[in-house]
Amino acid sequence: VREAWKSATDIDSLCSSLGISPYLDKPTRKLSTGMKQQVKLAMAISTGCPYLILDEPLNGLDPGKRKTSCDAMRSEVERGRSVLISSHLLDDLADLTNSFYFIEAGTLVEKIESSSQTLKQEYLDTYEGGE
């Protein structure tokens, strides 16, 4: 990863924060699904592009790694990057975002811009019939 792309991102620090430093010399085919997800996230972040588009970046991760990944994505937002995430894991992302778009069968069915608690309640009301 370090030599593949010239970027202002501190690769060593990024890999350390994601917990993947010990695995950098291993072929990805020998990594677990979760570790592969972490490597993919590190690669996306390391590009330095102003926009990150991530499809299910938390799938295959244990709760600790999901938090680590959310922290990394939050750091990128705080640095001024825009992050678009496609995910089914609402609980993990509720504290990370300020906007949620619910898409069903390719159609936008609802947009919510609010606090994480309001968002969770809106989701429950809309998709699970309330608490």
Describe these PLM feature segments.
Residues 52-56:
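Catalytic Walker B motif of ABC-type/P-loop ATPase nucleotide-binding domains
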Residues 86-88:
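H-loop/switch region of ABC-family ATPase nucleotide-binding domains
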